[in-house]
């Protein structure tokens, strides 16, 4: 951003007084890196640390950020403030050094709240669908020429980044309930997509505590703000009377203020009508599959309608929507060597969903778009606690595929829990008699084991939130199946 653009932005959004150097501990995370990217473009000196390089750190380095691939006390020297992700422990040497030097240490959401404080904030919360809905709202506002700032938890494929600094007063951000830090945010508009039991360690295992935290988040809206909520979700419907703010509901339900009707899916596109109160009915073509994405689009349209955005811009943005990284992310269709004596091909889709509801939505979208395909899932459970708490739900959902390969649980720093491991889950699924799962003990064996279950008319879903995305990219690079050596080809 040039000097003239910065001056224009400063007329809208004052800079943080006396803050020049901002250091991020865990800067390679999508949420952390997105905020760092916005601040770098605002002209702040950015540094950060993480354990290994990734596309986020590479992008920040190109913007002039100093990145350390270690955690050392000297990394925070001269920092005005240190921003930490929820994954960073209090005994991290950089955190300890910052406290000793009386450098403020704040959570990611506090910095996001500071970015939002002088802007018209739109926050997207909920157990599922936050990232995609954030991208949809951002796409509509950009298509309407409103040039928003956005901070997303996933890659916005149309922009090629997780976050972008705009020149207007609008800031669109994903709001994270996993550590309850979204309570720092004070938006003008808040979307809540759904509420389910997840991250229950944060809420001391008390679902009522989780529900009340969402209510408290919505009460951070000013009295003239607006909550946009999915009335199809039973928990949200239950909570509506407790929300003391203006509400717009959306969903397939007959009483929704923004109602989805006549949904049908053709391949990767959804087609449906959106019926709005006192507004023209919209005939929507959405370039994203699944009924869950129709709901995400309805939320985005509800916000855009409230803002007075032209319907033509809304429809253009949804029809050209390019999606987000690792959300039903199409990586290619690859020809296969002859399988069962017939030539064939397989589609490869990468998806971040790691909760049973998300996995179920992905499976349903795949079945609706490609009903004749052999549906193969490569799944990596995420966290032992989630696997334990949602064990039966996972077993029920994963029986819907035609073939299942399961990697070991991605621990995300957790210790193993007896009975909440992939071997146990495979055993339970096998006992239900619908699919015979294959345990993949070593991720390097995934491609070889996958080749053994392909039929030549396949849709392969690589599913999970851990490091399984690397496996998806590897499968795309090798075109799904390991290539034979010259010696193997010629016997």
From Swiss-Prot:
<keyword id="KW-0067">ATP-binding</keyword>
<keyword id="KW-0436">Ligase</keyword>
<keyword id="KW-0132">Cell division</keyword>
<dbReference type="InterPro" id="IPR050061">
    <property type="entry name" value="MurCDEF_pg_biosynth"/>
</dbReference>
<comment type="function">
    <text>Cell wall formation.</text>
</comment>
<dbReference type="InterPro" id="IPR000713">
    <property type="entry name" value="Mur_ligase_N"/>
</dbReference>
<dbReference type="Pfam" id="PF01225">
    <property type="entry name" value="Mur_ligase"/>
</dbReference>
<feature type="binding site">
    <location>
        <begin position="126"/>
        <end position="132"/>
    </location>
    <ligand>
        <name>ATP</name>
    </ligand>
</feature>
<comment type="pathway">
    <text>Cell wall biogenesis; peptidoglycan biosynthesis.</text>
</comment>
<dbReference type="InterPro" id="IPR036615">
    <property type="entry name" value="Mur_ligase_C_dom_sf"/>
</dbReference>
<dbReference type="Pfam" id="PF02875">
    <property type="entry name" value="Mur_ligase_C"/>
</dbReference>
<dbReference type="InterPro" id="IPR013221">
    <property type="entry name" value="Mur_ligase_cen"/>
</dbReference>
<keyword id="KW-0131">Cell cycle</keyword>
<dbReference type="GO" id="GO:0008360">
    <property type="term" value="P:regulation of cell shape"/>
</dbReference>
<keyword id="KW-0573">Peptidoglycan synthesis</keyword>
<keyword id="KW-0547">Nucleotide-binding</keyword>
<dbReference type="GO" id="GO:0051301">
    <property type="term" value="P:cell division"/>
</dbReference>
<dbReference type="GO" id="GO:0005737">
    <property type="term" value="C:cytoplasm"/>
</dbReference>
<dbReference type="InterPro" id="IPR005758">
    <property type="entry name" value="UDP-N-AcMur_Ala_ligase_MurC"/>
</dbReference>
<dbReference type="GO" id="GO:0009252">
    <property type="term" value="P:peptidoglycan biosynthetic process"/>
</dbReference>
<keyword id="KW-0133">Cell shape</keyword>
<keyword id="KW-0963">Cytoplasm</keyword>
<keyword id="KW-0961">Cell wall biogenesis/degradation</keyword>
<dbReference type="GO" id="GO:0008763">
    <property type="term" value="F:UDP-N-acetylmuramate-L-alanine ligase activity"/>
</dbReference>
<dbReference type="InterPro" id="IPR036565">
    <property type="entry name" value="Mur-like_cat_sf"/>
</dbReference>
<dbReference type="Pfam" id="PF08245">
    <property type="entry name" value="Mur_ligase_M"/>
</dbReference>
<dbReference type="GO" id="GO:0071555">
    <property type="term" value="P:cell wall organization"/>
</dbReference>
<dbReference type="InterPro" id="IPR004101">
    <property type="entry name" value="Mur_ligase_C"/>
</dbReference>
<comment type="similarity">
    <text>Belongs to the MurCDEF family.</text>
</comment>
<protein>
    <recommendedName>
        <fullName>UDP-N-acetylmuramate--L-alanine ligase</fullName>
        <ecNumber>6.3.2.8</ecNumber>
    </recommendedName>
</protein>
<dbReference type="GO" id="GO:0005524">
    <property type="term" value="F:ATP binding"/>
</dbReference>
